[in-house]
C-alpha cells in the first residue's frame, strides 16, 4: 500500500479523525487508500494523559478523495500553514479512517510502499496507546 509519513501530532489527529486535510507543498494525483505513518521527527509530543505519541510507525489507513490548492478558508484547519501560497490541500475522507497496529516502519519524505500483509487493523475499542 502507498504510505505517507506525517509529523506528530498531526499523524495521530488524522488517525483519530480530527484532521481531514493534510497540507503539502506538492500536489498528488493519488486517490484512494493511503497508509498514514508517524514520522521519526517531532519527538516529545504527549497526549493530555502524558502518553508519548508514537514515532516511526504506522497509524491509520485513510482515503484521499481530492487534492486542490489551499484556500484562505483552510487557514482555520488544524496544522494549516498561514501562508497559503504554493500549498496544497490533500482532502481525506473522514468516514473511512481505520486505525492500524503501530508497527515500526522505515518512513520516507515522499510516498513509499508498505507490504499489505504488515498492515493490521486494530480491534474496535482499542487505540495505538494500547500497544
State the predicted function of each range.
Residues 1-131:
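Structured alpha/beta reader/binder surfaces that contact nucleic acids or chromatin modification marks
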Amino acid at each position: 500500500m502507498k504510505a505517507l509519513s506525517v509529523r506528530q501530532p498531526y499523524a495521530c489527529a488524522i488517525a483519530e479523525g480530527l484532521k481531514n486535510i493534510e497540507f503539502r507543498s506538492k500536489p498528488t494525483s493519488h486517490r484512494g487508500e493511503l497508509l498514514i505513518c508517524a514520522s521519526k521527527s517531532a519527538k516529545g509530543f504527549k497526549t493530555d494523559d502524558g502518553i508519548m505519541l508514537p514515532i516511526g510507525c504506522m497509524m491509520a489507513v485513510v482515503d484521499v478523495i481530492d487534492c486542490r490548492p489551499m484556500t484562505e478558508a483552510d487557514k482555520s484547519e488544524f496544522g494549516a500553514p498561514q501562508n497559503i501560497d504554493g500549498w496544497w490541500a490533500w482532502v481525506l475522507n473522514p468516514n473511512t479512517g481505520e486505525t492500524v497496529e503501530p508497527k515500526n516502519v522505515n518512513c520516507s519524505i515522499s510516498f513509499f510502499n508498505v507490504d499489505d500483509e504488515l498492515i493490521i487493523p486494530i480491534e474496535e475499542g482499542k487505540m495505538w496507546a494500547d500497544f
